[in-house]
Amino acid sequence: MVLLESEQFLTELTRLFQKCRTSGSVYITLKKYDGRTKPIPKKGTVEGFEPADNKCLLRATDGKKKISTVVSSKEVNKFQMAYSNLLRANMDGLKKRDKKNKTKKTKAAAAAAAAAVAAAAAPAAAATTATPATPAATAATAAQ
């Protein structure tokens, strides 16, 4: 993995996006970075290790090429503005989800279920009355 400066990272990230524009994906991770290069021991803590300031570790990969950068808290605002502009420019290939079809399908299914419940309740209500009020009710009772 290549550790780059923030400006070089943004340039390489743009290249990754351009390379994967037609097919492929770019995976980006962001996490807090305390400056350690070795893992934390299981038993006990390392004494005397105090991180100077908060840092973020950004990693990006397309599956083959990996790049990373560390952004300190002092330059995070500048980096965030450049990073957000880069994401807006290169995430235009995303597909929008069609939410209207889902709501139409669920409304149609709910309407059909309500009609079935109403149809099942109508003959039962007509059977409980002594004299049918409409010809449709007589047909419903005759069908039973």
From Swiss-Prot:
Keywords: Cytoplasm, Phosphoprotein, Ribonucleoprotein, RNA-binding, Signal recognition particle. The keyword Zinc-finger does not apply. The keyword Phosphoprotein applies. One of its GO terms (biological process) is SRP-dependent cotranslational protein targeting to membrane. It comes from the Eukaryota. InterPro entries: Signal_recog_particle_SRP14, Signal_recog_particle_SRP9/14. The modification Phosphotyrosine is found at residue 27. GO terms for cellular component: signal recognition particle, endoplasmic reticulum targeting. One of its GO terms (molecular function) is endoplasmic reticulum signal peptide binding. It is found in: Cytoplasm. Belongs to the SRP14 family. Component of the signal recognition particle (SRP) complex, a ribonucleoprotein complex that mediates the cotranslational targeting of secretory and membrane proteins to the endoplasmic reticulum (ER). SRP9 together with SRP14 and the Alu portion of the SRP RNA, constitutes the elongation arrest domain of SRP. The complex of SRP9 and SRP14 is required for SRP RNA binding. Heterodimer with SRP9; binds RNA as heterodimer. Component of a signal recognition particle (SRP) complex that consists of a 7SL RNA molecule of 300 nucleotides and six protein subunits: SRP72, SRP68, SRP54, SRP19, SRP14 and SRP9. PANTHER family: SIGNAL RECOGNITION PARTICLE 14 KD PROTEIN. This is Signal recognition particle 14 kDa protein. The gene is SRP14.
